[in-house]
Amino acid sequence: MEKKANFAAYTTNDKVRFTMRKKLLILAACLSATALTAQNTNRTDSVRTQKMDEVVVTHRRQLVRNDIDKLTYDVQHDETAKTKSTLEILKQIPFVSVDGQENIKVQGSSSFKVYKNGHPDPGFSGQNLKEILKALPASNIKKIEVITDPGARYDAEGTTAILNIVMTNDTRLQGVSGNVNLSANTWGSMGAGAYLTTKTGKLTTTVSYNEYYQSAKQSEGGSEAAYHYIESGERSFASQNSSTKYNIHIGDISASYEIDSLNLLSASASGFGYAMDNNAHGTHERRDKDGSLIYHYDRRSYTPEYAYLNFGGRLDYQHKTHLDGEVLTLSYMLAATRRHNTSREEYSNAVNMPVSYTGYDLNSREHFSEHTFQVDYVRPFGKHHKLESGLKYILRHNNSLTFIDYTGTATDVDTHFKHGTQVAAAYLSYLVTAGKWSARTGLRYEYSYMKGEYPDGSNNSFHARLNDWVPSMSLQYKMTDTQSMKISYSTSINRPGITYLNPAVISSPNTRQYGNASLGSSRNQKLQISYMLNARKLTMNLTPYYDFTNNGITDIRYVEGRTIVSTYGNVQKRREAGLLTYTRWQPFRGTTLSMNASAKYARIAVPAPEVVENKGWSGSVFLDYGQKLPWKLHFDTSLALQCGHPIRGPYAYEARWHNYRFTINRSFLNDRLSVAVYANMPFTTREKYRYRTVHGDYTGYNLSWDKTRFFGIRASWSFGKLKASVKKAERSIQNDDLVGGVKK
């Protein structure tokens, strides 16, 4: 039996592997023959031959790469990505966590933005990001970049990190390529999508469309809440059952035209929309400190019409000079959002009803539009120095209409609110490399003018002028080819969105909520150190960090009579220290183990209306085990959990949770067709999530549960030969803005 000798080497495809193996065999044979001839002094008229062992060149591609400003995960070469959704693949990416209810955090924070192909996309914004990423197959994605240190080039507002989803290949290939994917599960939810890339002469286009339907049966769940009101000693209890079904549509078209080797014109348009139907029914009661009934009523709510449409377009012109690396980019972006909500609340079986109405109809419309103009210029100086500079102007308009028609004697609500923002920004960034060292520093200035007005005369108009200087800096040392260390400092700001600003009052029998038109921007600062090891079989990252803010935008809650009142203010003081770690280990061929974990201590304080402080330790971990099996099968299992006391704002603790999944997939037709079957939490009927309110005018808990056990199948088929993909400008528009309300 011949013995195989394995040598690790880096190749790009099977063709290169075969060519290298052939050359190594020839070279080894020649060297062996020469050596044997030199040792044989008696026979010089012949060459002694020896049969060589087969030399197999294998390739272990590193899926994670660390740069001075970002960490990149190679989705395209992750074998498990062919039959996963983008939401599932996020669990495997360093610094990213997805909890049991599919809420996404980056570096432990929900303050992040999602880009597509290097620029903000209207389809990846809003409050339903998890549904969008669930509908998008990972097979359409090349890589995902976690920009942990957004420098001066990125907007100062709205983000401490950026997820950049790169969906097309930037290499010069040629031809036609496409992909079709289908998915379904046992609850009746299903999805379908396709994309196609073509090239005609110098024109390259990419078109994609995805649709996802979630059945009401999958989202069936319930909740209960019990609270104790400290001052009065009264107690309340509420319970409800609910279900939600929705249909999501995501479309995108991109095109580029290479005028010549120095000039490139690219454009794209995208759209995202969904319709939702929600139904809920339950009961609510309140008792005094002696247990006597104060009031009781049953509640039913439904949403006969909820429509959300998000669309946008982008145009970039890129000019390169004959100096290598010098680039000028001119960009324009349009983003628009339309949202229409019609809902109905009904109350029945009432005893001592606390309000003078038995129901109401809510009709709200929100419109958002944004125009962005940007100029970017990059100029290298020698081999080790580079300057980046740019100018940006943003014009935003928000328009909100809210009408509440009460059934009873309560006064109807009719509010019209307009909000406009203008932002002018300039930045300068300097990058230097010297041997194993690299450093980047930058400064950004932003001027913003905000104006709010009430055409109905219900409130006085207001305006604000803000000036913000935002510095950033990073220093990286590459100890070896596989190890590096980085330290960075960054700042960011948050400006309030229309939901946070809109003063319209929305009431229920026991709650009242309204926005705060006087909100200003908040400032966040962060310091972190990152160690990266990228060895042949082991990838590891350790990142301790500390961040803080003194005027964060937060919700303010208090009790007024028997009503819980909530609004917003620039009053949050936050301190957080933590450790992020990622490990990916390939102990032997065909086996992969990975862990994405974090631990942190956080403290939040709110001084108004009374001093409230919330603090606690918490941790989360995602474990994944992948194993290649005979007959081209691949088995994958994952486990995720959250532990400790994760704080939820200044008043409450988040729920602890766990989640697990088993997947088997196989490729057919020369790896063009991939099919996966999976089981999500097969040994758990439903998962419970308990949120505990421990501070403020009332304490208690909110317990919710949903269905977690289901089975599904996914299939992805690739066709054609890709030889050229859409080229994109190396610089483009990024708007990292707004907390709360309708975004792009």
What are these regions (language model features)?
Residues 164-180, 219, 223, 237, 449-451, 481-526, 546-565, 682-696, ...:
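Surface-exposed extracellular loop regions of Gram-negative outer-membrane beta-barrel proteins
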Residues 40-79, 99-101, 107-111, 147-149:
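Short, acidic, small-residue-rich periplasmic hinge/interaction motif at the N-terminus
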